[in-house]
Every structure is written in C-alpha cells, then in structure tokens.
C-alpha cells in the first residue's frame, strides 16, 4: 500500500448535524475530550462562563452561546486521525452547513431524547440524502426524561426514512438512568453523573448476566431490561456495514453528552466503521484518494479568524495525494500557479502551520481575495470538483451607513462577508444601493456585528422590496443584452460579478420567466464558476 493510500485509510472526516440546542457543541467538546485533544471541556451553557466551548470562537458566538461559523478540529484516536467539522447550530445557517457537508465522508446526527426529530434535522438529513452520506445517530440528554427509546427509533425511521440499527440501549432515563448496554459486545456501561469536565471511564460489566450487576442497578430494573432487550433485538435491524455506508441505515447510540456518558462507545464504533476518504467527481473524471498527485477544493472562507491580523483563510479539503508545506499548486479557476506557503491545520481557534496533510484532512490557506468558495487546486490538471453550490437567498435587506464617508469600508466588508458565503451581496445595475441577501434573519445581525467589530463600520439593514433572486444565463449574447435592457431595474451583480434578477414578488419572477423563454433563471449557482473581485 502506498504512503498516500495508507494515510488516507486512517482518516475519518465527518460533521455533526442537529437541530439547535440538541447538544451538538457539547458533544463536539466531549469527542475532543475523549480524543485527548483538550484536557478540559468548556461547558456551552453558561454564557458568561470563563471557559467558552473550544469550537465557538467568534466573539458573537461567545456572547450568544451558539455556533455561528463552522470550524475544523483534528485529533488522533486509536491509530486513526479524526477530522471533525463543526457546523453552525443556529437555524439560519443553511448554506455554510450545506457546504461543510460537501467536504465530509460521513455525519453524526444528534437528537434530543425529549424532542425527537425536529425540523432542522429533517432539512439537514435531506442534504445528506443528496450525497448518500453515511450517518450515525446519537440520542442525547438521556439524563433527562424523554420519549420512549423504541418510539424514538420508530420516529427516526418514519420521519427521516432511514433504517435504525441500535448499537447501545439505555437502562432507564432521567432520574432512573443507570447506564447503557452495548448490543454488539453485550457489555454494560454504568452511568456515573457529575464528572463532566474530565474524561470519565465508566464502570463496565462484561454482560447483563455478570455477578454484581443486580446490586448496582436493582433486580427489578435488570428484569425489565432483559424483557426490553428481547423486544428490541427481535424488532430492530442488526447493524449492516454496507447498508450504513450506502446511507440506508443509521447505527444508533444513547447517552448524555454533558455528562460524558455514552460518548466513548460511539467514538470507538465510529473510528472502526465510518468510511475513510472516498473517490470524488470532477468535471473531467472521478479522482480516487490514493492517487499520488494533490487535489483539493475550497468549501469555506472565513475572514478575521485572528482579529489582530485581519486575515482571511480559505478552508480546503484534500481529496487526493499529499500536501507538503510550500508546495506549488495549480489554481484551476484562474489558470495560475499558486504557492501554498503557510497553510494551517486547526484545533478550533488554535492554528498550527501544516508540515503535511493527506486525503480527508482540511488545511487553511491564507487568502487575499484571490480564492473563492468552490475553487479547485491540483498539481497541474485542469479539473474542477462539482457539487458545491451557492443558493438563492430568501431574505433581503438594504445596507444603510451611519457615516457616509465609510462607504469604501462598507463595500469591502460586505464583499468579504459574501466571499465567505455567510451572506450574499448584490449591487443593482441602476442604483447605488448595496443589498444583502441571506438564508435567515440572524445572518443580518452577524453581518452588522462583524462590520462594526472587524471593519469599524456602523451599518443598519432596512427592508427592501426584493422577494427572491435568480441567477440568469443565456447562451445567446444578443438575447441576453435585450433582456438586460428591458429588465435593468431588476438586475444586479453579485459579489463575483454574475448577473442576478432581483424579483419584487414571486408573480413578477414568473412573468419575467414567461417573457424571456431563452433566459435560464437558476436558484443555485455552482460556487466553482465564480469570477473573483477585489
């Protein structure tokens, strides 16, 4: 086996998806704790607590207690290298989350035991479906009262349309929680609450027949457990590796992230069964991870990870070959060579210069406005990875400046925020308005906060009569020019210089489409096909 193939086979790159408040950031912390990446997990709950959660590093996130930006963390575990991409927990952050899911090989779905499958989980699951992403499920907050576990499995199967294969099973819940049984090994892990900031190895009995277990959990509970296990093993699906890797079955674990309980069986199972990096499609061919030449694509751009340095970092997922510090690469969209000098590896906000990286790893490249989301880097081959979209925003606001002299800073700030993909920025052809588009309201708060915090610009966002946006394309130049002349009042350029139709109403959009049958109106745009500005 080549060195590239060997290193690729050790990688496990995944994201955690959940509805807000299901405990995703806490679970992220605990996985890092068990992986030895952090000594002490920061609790997410206390907003004013001295120790903030490791993965929530932007000041706004620290104030609000939600993950606004997706960060990347790497840790070694049991001979494997785990790359965990944290996704925003708040309901608004659809696009960024979608793009993160294009950069992973599997996902972990977190469900609150009391709430079951929630709306955001359904949406994220649809995204995973598009790519048949393998998913494991962690049913969290077992230390609180919640739904019956059998009912929960039924709900996941019915609502999300995926077969469940329980791997651990709870012994009680809430006040009566005593532990979990590992259905594949037969081991019983006892619940010992309280030591939630340090790594906790629970007491393990080899089976439910082990002497001393009845004294620990009570004879009646043990009898109930035997009956329940008979029922579960008779009614549920056994774990099937092929079905899981095809995205048709989800192995299910129960636990309490905040109490470090049930996390270790999940992590052990994950590194053993989750897929290593997979082959990926480009415009020219399919690229296998074990190929010797480096390829990778940018799925996210983050500005000002270090406020002292006003920097922008492009996050690149390596798809094949070996990255080494300072190597020369080919930036496919611009057709230019680019030296990747001080590339970074991540442990949330702690950044280290990457000496080398392998398929499945994510590196950060310093970016001065030349790199866009969706860009592909190779060692010379002109291919582009596909499937990294921009979505048409659903909400629009006009930016208003408190100080008109700061227009230049405002334009620069909006262009950079748009380059990250958190919000989109449109400049109408016939006015000087600056219009921002987003998938959710919170993104406008984030934009206003970051403009003030990072660019020194105080801006407000007011309502604007735009209901939806569509990118417009036409292969016939003459017809496109006619369309531009007739519809100039509704046309704008996005931050990458593409023509966009801003419709005041859905009816207006429908009429425009009917009147111009030769023009294609798209709700998404492949991020790779951008023309960078600034």
From Swiss-Prot:
GO biological process: regulation of translational termination
Pfam families (UniProt xref): EF-G_D2 (PF22042), GTP_EFTU (PF00009), RF3_C (PF16658)
One annotated Gene Ontology cellular component of this protein: cytosol
Binding residues annotated for GTP, in chain numbering: 18-25, 86-90, 140-143
CDD domains, per database record: RF3, RF3_II, RF3_III
Annotated tr-type G domain residues: 9-278
Metal-binding listed as a keyword: no
GO molecular function: GTP binding; GTPase activity; guanosine tetraphosphate binding; translation release factor activity, codon nonspecific; translation release factor activity, codon specific
Cellular localization per UniProt: Cytoplasm
Sorted UniProt keywords: Cytoplasm, GTP-binding, Nucleotide-binding, Protein biosynthesis
Keyword Cytoplasm: yes
HAMAP family (alphabetical): Rel_fac_3
Role this protein plays: Increases the formation of ribosomal termination complexes and stimulates activities of RF-1 and RF-2. It binds guanine nucleotides and has strong preference for UGA stop codons. It may interact directly with the ribosome. The stimulation of RF-1 and RF-2 is significantly reduced by GTP and GDP, but not by GMP.
NCBIfam families associated with the record: prfC (TIGR00503), PRK00741.1 (NF001964), small_GTP (TIGR00231)
Protein family per UniProt: Belongs to the TRAFAC class translation factor GTPase superfamily. Classic translation factor GTPase family. PrfC subfamily.
Name of protein: Peptide chain release factor 3
Species this chain originates from: Stenotrophomonas maltophilia (strain R551-3)
Underlying gene: prfC
């Amino acid at each position: 086996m080549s060195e590239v193939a060997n290193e690729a086979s050790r990688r496990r790159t995944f994201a955690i998806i959940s509805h807000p408040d299901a405990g995703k950031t806490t679970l992220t912390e605990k996985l890092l704790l068990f992986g030895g990446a952090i000594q002490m997990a920061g609790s997410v709950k206390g907003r004013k607590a001295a120790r903030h959660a490791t993965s929530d590093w932007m000041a706004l996130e620290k104030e609000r207690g939600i993950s606004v930006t997706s960060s990347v963390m790497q840790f070694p575990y049991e001979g494997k290298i785990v790359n965990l991409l944290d996704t925003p927990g708040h309901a608004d952050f659809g696009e960024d989350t979608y793009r993160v899911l294009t950069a992973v090989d599997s996902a972990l779905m977190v469900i609150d035991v009391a709430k079951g499958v929630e709306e955001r989980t359904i949406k994220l699951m649809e995204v995973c479906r598009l790519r048949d992403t393998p998913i494991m499920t962690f049913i969290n907050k077992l230390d609180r009262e919640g739904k019956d576990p059998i009912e929960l499995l039924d709900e996941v199967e019915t609502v999300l349309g995926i077969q469940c294969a329980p791997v651990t099973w709870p012994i009680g819940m809430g006040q009566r929680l005593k532990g979990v049984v590992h259905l594949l090994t037969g081991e019983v892990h006892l619940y010992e609450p309280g030591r939630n900031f340090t790594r906790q190895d629970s007491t393990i009995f080899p089976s439910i027949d082990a002497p001393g277990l009845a004294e620990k959990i009570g004879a009646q509970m043990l009898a109930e457990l035997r009956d329940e296990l008979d029922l579960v093993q008779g009614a549920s699906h056994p774990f099937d590796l092929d079905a899981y890797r095809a995205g048709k079955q989800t192995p299910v674990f129960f636990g309490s992230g905040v109490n470090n309980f049930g996390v270790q069986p999940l992590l052990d199972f994950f590194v053993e069964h989750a897929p290593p990096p997979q082959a990926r499609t480009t415009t020219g061919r399919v690229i296998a991870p074990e190929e010797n030449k480096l390829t990778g694509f940018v799925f996210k751009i983050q500005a000002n990870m270090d406020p002292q340095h006003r920097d922008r970092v492009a996050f690149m997922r390596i798809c094949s070959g070996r990255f080494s510090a300072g190597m020369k690469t080919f930036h496919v969209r611009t057709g230019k060579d680019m030296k990747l000098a001080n590339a970074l590896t991540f442990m949330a906000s702690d950044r280290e210069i990457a000496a080398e990286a392998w398929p499945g790893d994510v590196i950060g490249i310093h970016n001065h406005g030349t790199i866009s989301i969706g860009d592909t880097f190779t060692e010379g081959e002109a291919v582009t990875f596909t499937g990294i979209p921009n979505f048409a925003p659903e909400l629009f606001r006009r930016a208003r400046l408190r100080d008109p002299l700061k227009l230049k800073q405002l334009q620069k700030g909006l262009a950079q925020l748009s380059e990250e993909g958190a919000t989109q920025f449109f400049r109408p052809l016939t006015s000087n308005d600056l219009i921002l588009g987003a998938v959710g309201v919170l993104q406008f708060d984030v934009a206003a906060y970051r403009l003030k915090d990072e660019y020194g610009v105080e801006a407000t966002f007011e309502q604007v009569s735009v209901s939806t946006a569509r990118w417009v394309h036409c292969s016939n130049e003459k017809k496109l020019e006619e369309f531009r002349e007739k519809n100039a009042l509704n046309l704008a350029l996005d931050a990458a210089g593409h023509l966009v139709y801003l419709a005041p109403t859905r009816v207006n959009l429908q009429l425009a489409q009917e009147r111009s049958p030769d023009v294609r109106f798209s709700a998404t745009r492949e991020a790779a096909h951008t023309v960078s500005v600034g």
